[in-house]
């Protein structure tokens, strides 16, 4: 079945409170998707973020970002006043997220809401309610964040030895000492899940499904690595011997040093990949389809000695291969899992075979199609139908920004290949959209910025850089009636029209 969707991070939605949330604007965007003939909304990971603001470095694989809690709904519940929300300074740039102001302004409001919410409830009742509504791993995240705050937001490797190594007497003492702070984080997760479930339910009522995103690796500064050190390649002091990344290539002479702890795949095998089954249960409950980041890491992963300043001296190690996906099929009771494999970059024959064996759709990105001239596997005439095509992803420049960066030879090849000229001058983004929608790929997903024709300033992320990543926001006026009608018309022309 041919379908289409739009890619837009929740954080990039318009909002009067500085960052997108599960607010009226999210519901309006779902209405827009329906009007535009779309079937999917693809988002980025929803986990809580820290330094760097990357959704791919989260404090937990089983928790939600409190930035996305809708403050308006908390006012409707009597937990905040409108004046309290409007008095907070979240920044005044409708195009840019100021994460420092979000952090400084949002948590005091959430704490006020928590104080009112827990009024009349004993700490025991708060934790009992959390026990009914939240999973064990989510509650472990709440404990982790309470302890982390106790140690001035430091990562767990800098905590006192007893709690760092999770000695039973220390765990008991900190749970007792921080019971109210734990309750504060449990409150956040309860509200996050309530609001997300309501938004997802509304999306389904409108015929829109959600494509989520799951990073392959857990962050070092996370509840996952602290609470379950046996899952990772840690020594007797719970420190990594090697960390994750990518080797040097044409884009980076020293490679990419991500710094995430690597999995102890032998332990995962012995336990039937139980932690991964729990993780996928959480994701399948949250989303309708799940994009699995860095799929090739399940075949082979790049291990960089811990402490190295660059990724130059890593080595390739074998991953779990098809075994983990066979276990998922058995666990979830079906051959066809709702997974999209992020299979971008250099692919070895064994990675290609793994993708074929799983049957998962891979990804095709048009911005990569013209790097190797006529030999590129990303050119639409080389696709099979079992794939998802994008003009670009969150890691790419916008279509307009990308095209402007090409030399004249490559621009001419792009124009010649996609038949540029059907649309008015200066609308190369629409030509690329048409090429994606017209391909044989079962699903086409277009970043909102590429429907809007925005330049590099609307880019979401530039890998291996720090600074203004993850900050772009859409305005309320962007997806106007004319653009929505054009999206719907193209979806119809190419046989991808969603439910009316």
Each language-model region and where it sits:
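N-terminal regions that are enriched for targeting/export leaders
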Residues: 1-11, 24-27
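Alpha-amylase-like alpha-glycosidases and glucanotransferases acting on alpha-linked glucans and related
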Residues: 9, 15, 53-193, 218-445, ...
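A short, glycine/small-residue-rich beta-strand->loop->alpha-helix junction that serves as a flexible
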Residues: 18-22
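Catalytic domains of carbohydrate-active enzymes, especially glycoside hydrolases
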Residues: 24-49, 286-287
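Domain-scale activation on soluble regions of proteins
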Residues: 35, 163, 472, 485, ...
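Outer-envelope exported proteins of Gram-negative bacteria
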Residues: 44, 209-211, 215, 289, ...
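Conserved, well-ordered alpha-helix/loop/beta-strand core segments that scaffold catalytic motifs
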Residues: 185, 189-218
């Amino acid at each position: 079945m041919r379908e289409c969707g739009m890619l837009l991070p929740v954080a990039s939605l318009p909002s009067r409170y500085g960052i997108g949330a599960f607010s009226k604007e999210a519901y309006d965007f779902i209405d827009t998707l329906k009007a535009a003939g779309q079937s999917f909304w693809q988002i980025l990971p929803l986990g809580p973020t820290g330094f760097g603001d990357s959704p791919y470095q989260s404090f937990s694989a089983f928790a939600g970002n409190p930035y996305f809690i809708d403050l308006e709904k908390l006012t409707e519940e009597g937990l905040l006043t409108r004046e309290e929300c409007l008095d907070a300074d979240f920044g005044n740039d409708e195009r840019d997220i100021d994460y420092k102001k979000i952090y400084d302004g949002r948590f005091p409001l959430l704490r006020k809401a928590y104080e009112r919410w827990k009024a009349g409830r004993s700490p025991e009742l708060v934790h009992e309610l959390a026990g009914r509504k939240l999973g064990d791993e989510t509650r472990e995240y709440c404990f982790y964040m309470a302890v982390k705050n106790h140690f001035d937001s430091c990562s767990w490797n800098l905590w006192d030895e007893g709690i760092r190594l999770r000695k039973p007497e220390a765990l008991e003492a900190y749970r007792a000492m921080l019971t109210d702070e734990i309750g504060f984080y449990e409150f956040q997760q309860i509200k996050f899940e309530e609001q997300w479930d309501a938004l997802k339910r509304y999306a389904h009522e409108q015929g829109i499904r959600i494509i989520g995103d799951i990073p392959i690796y857990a962050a070092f500064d996370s509840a996952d690595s602290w609470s379950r050190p046996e899952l990772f390649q840690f020594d007797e002091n719970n420190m990594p011997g090697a960390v994750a990344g990518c080797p040097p290539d044409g884009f980076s002479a020293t490679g990419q040093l991500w710094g995430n702890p690597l999995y102890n795949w032998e332990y995962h095998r012995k336990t039937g990949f139980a932690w991964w089954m729990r993780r996928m249960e959480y994701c399948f409950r949250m989303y309708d389809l799940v994009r699995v980041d860095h799929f090739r890491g399940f075949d082979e992963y790049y291990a960089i000695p811990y402490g190295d300043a660059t990724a130059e001296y890593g080595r390739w190690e074998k991953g779990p291969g098809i075994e983990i996906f066979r276990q998922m099929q058995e666990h979830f009771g079906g051959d066809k899992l709702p997974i999209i494999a992020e299979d971008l970059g250099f692919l070895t024959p064994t990675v290609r075979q793994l993708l074929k064996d799983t049957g998962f759709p891979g990804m095709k990105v048009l911005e990569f199609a013209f790097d190797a001239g006529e030999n590129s596997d990303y050119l639409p005439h080389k696709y099979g139908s079992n794939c998802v095509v994008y003009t670009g992803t969150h890691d790419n420049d916008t279509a307009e920004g990308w095209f402007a960066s090409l030399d004249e030879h490559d621009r001419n090849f792009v124009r010649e290949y996609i038949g540029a000229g059907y649309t008015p001058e200066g609308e190369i983004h629409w030509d690329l959209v048409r090429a994606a929608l017209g391909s044989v790929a079962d699903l086409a997903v277009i970043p909102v910025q590429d429907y809007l024709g925005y330049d590099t300033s609307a880019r979401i992320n530039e890998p291996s850089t720090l600074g203004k990543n993850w900050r772009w926001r859409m305005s309320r006026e962007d997806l106007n009636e004319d653009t929505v009608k054009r999206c719907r018309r193209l979806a119809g022309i190419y046989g991808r029209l969603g439910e009316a």
